[in-house]
Amino acid sequence: MAIFLVLPTDQSDPILRALKDNQSLGTVDFTDLPKNGFVVNFSGTTQELSNLLGITDGSSASGVVVAISSYYGRAPTTLWEWIKSRWNS
């Protein structure tokens, strides 16, 4: 699986609902970012994740999906632990 950053460019609630629905199906795993956006563990491409969340066709909300190849910065410990536990999983 790969780690992605999903950034809503409008309302985040429709994307959150899509993430929760797919998490219950075991398709994705995710955690919220402190202000806006989500870090997502998914076994497909950026386009496939965008399609799954309804971003591509606009059926949920608009947003940007970015694959993460490395990470660094300052964030809550729980976020770093979440990423580390899923990196290369």
Indicate residue ranges for each PLM-predicted region.
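Short amphipathic alpha-helix segments
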Residues: 5-25
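Short, aromatic/basic amphipathic alpha-helical patches
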Residues: 17-24, 51-55, 79-83
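Short, intrinsically disordered low-complexity segments
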Residues: 25-75
